[in-house]
Curated annotation (Swiss-Prot):
Gene responsible for this protein: chvI
Domain of life: Bacteria
Compartment(s) where it occurs, according to its Swiss-Prot or TrEMBL record: Cytoplasm
Source organism of the structure: Rhizobium radiobacter (Agrobacterium tumefaciens)
CDD domains in the record: REC_OmpR_ChvI-like (cd19936), trans_reg_C (cd00383)
Residue ranges that the Swiss-Prot or TrEMBL entry lists as coiled coil: none
Any one Pfam family match given in the protein's UniProt record, by short name: Trans_reg_C
Name used for this protein in its record: Transcriptional regulatory protein ChvI
Molecular function terms, GO-annotated: metal ion binding; phosphorelay response regulator activity; transcription cis-regulatory region binding
Gene3D superfamilies per UniProt: 3.40.50.2300, 6.10.250.690, Winged helix-like DNA-binding domain superfamily/Winged helix DNA-binding domain
Cofactor(s) named in the record: Mg(2+)
GO biological process: regulation of DNA-templated transcription
UniProt binding sites for Mg(2+): D8, D9, D52
Length: 241
């Protein structure tokens, strides 16, 4: 049974999220602040951790910083709408994804499943020492569009040879958008690509992900302008010049 650590000072969130995850067969360990969680997470690493950012005694960012000194387990942050700067810092520290409050329990569960699948694939690849010849399916998972390169098997993305750190959802959105270079994708299609099941997300959710994608690419290339807005429709990954 896979274990998930949940750290939040809101006991209602601890209870509701624990119930949702336990229904899916996960074991859940809960903590009410970062200070009480740090020793337990290092001594008994779970398969995945979910942190709130703003907590008493030790916030989620400091907890992640200390955890990363000992462990590389996947981490999802629960954030407020005004914590965009914290998100960028969290990604640099090694967070895997962010979910904005208030959130759907079903959405959170699907994010957890997606990240654990990715982690399992990464561990399997590491176990082989990277020496196995890629299968046809694995080769098909490698996408190249101009200066963009994405490896779905390893969940890596580069632009002009420079790595770009993406969350699971951002990766899936871009991996759906890039093959349609020059044509564009409707928001509904991007939602379907990013979420495994019929999880409700509104247009603004996709818009927020696109905004973060643009910012991340601009960190490695200040002139990046390849993700274009198609007003009233969706987005387009521009064709390489």
């Amino acid at each position: 049974m896979q274990t998930i650590a949940l750290v939040d000072d809101d006991r209602n969130i601890l209870t509701s999220v624990s119930i949702a995850l336990e229904r899916e067969g996960y074991r859940v360990e809960t903590y009410t602040d970062g200070a009480s969680a740090v020793d337990g997470l290092i001594a008994r690493p779970p398969q995945l951790a979910i942190f709130d950012i703003k907590m008493p005694r030790m916030d989620g960012m400091e907890l992640l910083r200390r955890l990363r000194q000992k462990s590389d387990i996947p981490v999802i942050f629960l954030t407020s709408k005004d914590e965009e700067i914290d998100e960028l810092f969290g990604l640099k520290m090694g967070a895997d994804d962010f979910i904005t409050k208030p959130f759907s329990q079903r959405l959170l569960v699907e994010r957890v499943k997606a990240i654990l699948r990715r982690a399992s694939s990464r561990e399997a690849s590491a176990a082989t020492g990277g020496t196995l010849k890629p299968t046809a399916d694995q080769q098909a998972r490698t996408l190249e569009r101009g200066q963009l390169a994405m490896d779905q098997e390893r969940h890596t993305c580069t632009w002009k040879g420079e790595p770009v750190t993406l969350t699971v959802t951002e990766f899936l959105i871009l991996h759906s958008l890039a093959p349609a270079a020059g044509r564009g994708e409707k928001r509904d299609a991007l939602m379907d690509a990013a979420y495994d099941e019929q999880v409700y997300v509104d247009d603004r959710t996709i818009d927020s992900h696109i905004k973060r994608l643009r910012k991340k690419f601009k960190l490695v290339d200040g002139d990046f302008d390849m993700i274009e807005t198609l007003y009233g429709v969706g987005y387009r990954f521009a064709e390489a010049a």
